[in-house]
Curated annotation (Swiss-Prot):
Name of the protein: Calpain-13
Gene designation per UniProt: CAPN13
Highest taxon in the source lineage: Eukaryota
Keyword Protease in annotation: yes
Limits of the Calpain catalytic domain: 34-333
Amino acid sequence: MAYYQEPSVETSIIKFKDQDFTTLRDHCLSMGRTFKDETFPAADSSIGQKLLQEKRLSNVIWKRPQDLPGGPPHFILDDISRFDIQQGGAADCWFLAALGSLTQNPQYRQKILMVQSFSHQYAGIFRFRFWQCGQWVEVVIDDRLPVQGDKCLFVRPRHQNQEFWPCLLEKAYAKLLGSYSDLHYGFLEDALVDLTGGVITNIHLHSSPVDLVKAVKTATKAGSLITCATPSGPTDTAQAMENGLVSLHAYTVTGAEQIQYRRGWEEIISLWNPWGWGEAEWRGRWSDGSQEWEETCDPRKSQLHKKREDGEFWMSCQDFQQKFIAMFICSEIPITLDHGNTLHEGWSQIMFRKQVILGNTAGGPRNDAQFNFSVQEPMEGTNVVVCVTVAVTPSNLKAEDAKFPLDFQVILAGSQRFREKFPPVFFSSFRNTVQSSNNKFRRNFTMTYHLSPGNYVVVAQTRRKSAEFLLRIFLKMPDSDRHLSSHFNLRMKGSPSEHGSQQSIFNRYAQQRLDIDATQLQGLLNQELLTGPPGDMFSLDECRSLVALMELKVNGRLDQEEFARLWKRLVHYQHVFQKVQTSPGVLLSSDLWKAIENTDFLRGIFISRELLHLVTLRYSDSVGRVSFPSLVCFLMRLEAMAKTFRNLSKDGKGLYLTEMEWMSLVMYN
């Protein structure tokens, strides 16, 4: 069953290998000793196979940072920067390039690094968090690092061996994947998602006509991580080339600009190499000290061009598109660049967690899993993004896998109604395959579509024993929903007393009576509170519900005092909606708990996860959006039901009702 993210998904932290950081640290402090992690020991098994030759492996020793030459160790010295990172003996540029981009984004790095030090409550134990299949996983490590000749074997600490957060974070990631050998060559997409839980946009530089400067600026504005990769060279290993670039290598994209050059403008892009030293920088046009920088009269020249031996450099966008093969953007929501590189903020998400398919190794038809979704309205450009993340487990990760362990197809279901599972005959008779996946093995795979309105089914099959995975389906929302905030009447931004229109509005719709019914309330709300398309309006049934919840005389009408109480809530709910919305006019069902927390009338009211799941089904549409009228009905009903229970319960734990009392309570409200 599909569900939308609940607060427990965001707040609960999974303890990797059931290791609790606080318990382990406090135990070590009480015993006066430093932590030794037996689940990732200071041994050859943690380095893994095929990374080092046996002779070199025998020379590896493990030391804590304070035992290395240099000044006193620090977790973070001054501030976090990509220049704190220097790649070592593992070919994990794919991880370090993503990490370099992460350093520019406080939103993500705070989730991963947390506050730690080598002084306060130091016990030789550190922790880091990674996103795995919809949940944050906390990995605990000790601070013993593999060294040779007093030099760290893998990521090198900078600032005279004094700053160690990159080394320790790399070790935690190696533990998560199995060993340091599992860091040796990988995919940028996997690292980006593991560090953020975001969605990947893959730009094929040789074939995609993209305005790179605008794309980078758009993605940066959205808080995205941006990386890129070079193609392989004559060998299947990273090799430094004459132009200063490295083949089969990952880089961090750090900026892009239009710069004045001669009598026109030229587009340039800034990159950083995780090798972290000047010899591994681009030597062509716009490189450090090049003729182009001498000739430009751009007033930003001194700001942009800082010649340092740090692995960062500029190059022209034209050269970039020729020399690099792909650029990867990772963001909380899909970044679609098919319509002028504009950022479309209105997306809803359906998430299927902990999905397991049992394979069929004995031959015969393969087992499958099916996931349904609907496209409601036609729109231009990419409107559906399907993301697959395979769990990091020994059964899923096998080096001999040459292809993605799951096959995926998106199939148009036509007029077929959704059911638990379509039979095989359905697929043989309809054959409406939109797209299938066919890709080399990686743990994260993203497919983008432009789909017409209709019902669709995602079919997943596995090639071997079993596979556990997360499936996320992002559906673009139409502009009318995205700009719902513009449908609010601006007179509602103040409190009722500020605009002074409550009484006059009521009198106008009461038509010389002292009260209004549901039909009059519907006209009042849709004319005075909302000005938008019909789908955003209060329905008659919703207005009947509001009347039933607010009236005290049980006559199906609201008098002026009852209307004043309703109006006060509507104004407050509007502020709640605008505060909680994911993007302008878009409130997702996964954020209903935030609406509860921000509603003054619900102080002291708590609901369970099970009830929260039920109300998301009750008050959201097919793609997980909650309209303003639906939010109003939900919040008012929750307040009314909680107050009713407290009024009727004698002990606050339960209540006794006759059948007629129960029926009267639930049928009218």
